[in-house]
Amino acid sequence: MKKKKVKPVKQMGSTGTKLQKEVAAMEEAMKQHHIEEQCQLLIDEMMPQIKRLGRSLSGTYHRNIIEYTTSRIKSPESIVEKLHRKNREVSLDKAVATLRDLAGIRVICSFQDDVYRVAGAIKNLPGYELVKEKNYINKPKASGYRSIHLILRPANTAYDINYIEIQVRSAAMNYWAILEYQLCYKNEKKGAE
């Protein structure tokens, strides 16, 4: 089944006003419930563990295994668009209950073999439960996108946000993912003009 593309809020015609209101409401609800702060705390707790894991693997294999890491918190606009894409009610409660990628970390490795080493080590981190794994290396998306996505849940959390997504890919895979995103965004922008 082909995913329906949702145009970014700024590009929508008459429905833009409704979506803009939904985004504003989501932004306000996220502020009231300190969602960004909770996501950042999850990221801040996970990041040192990934860096330690990288140092350990680099020592074992006598070379740099993890090139770099980045993190992000899903924006209110992206949350609203994803809820629409999944035909879900647009509310903070629904987002927190159903979206497992509000907080995310991307781990860029040197080589494909390293991706599997790092993903395997992340799955076994103490204090986290692996909830879901998507292997887009074995089964790439139609666009050619390749990566491993891990959804983890901290064993002990006092937050409303109970999941963090870790994407692990090689530098070459990351280059393709960035290029694909830019091409897709450029085509959507052209279609809206």
Could you tell me what each predicted segment is?
Residues 2-57, 160-193:
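An acidic, glycine-/histidine-flanked metal-binding catalytic module
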Residues 10-11, 66-69, 95-96, 108:
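Glycine-rich, low-complexity intrinsically disordered segments
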Residues 32-35, 39, 43, 76, ...:
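Generic alpha-helical secondary structure
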Residues 38, 42-88:
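Surface-exposed, low-hydrophobicity interaction/linker segments
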Residues 42, 99-101, 144:
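Solvent-exposed loop and beta-edge segments used for protein-protein assembly and interaction
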Residues 91-100:
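Short, flexible, solvent-exposed loop/turn segments with mixed acidic/basic and small polar residues
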Residues 96, 108-193:
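Long beta-strand-rich cores associated with HINT superfamily self-processing modules
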Residues 102-108:
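Terminal, regulation- and interaction-focused segments at domain boundaries
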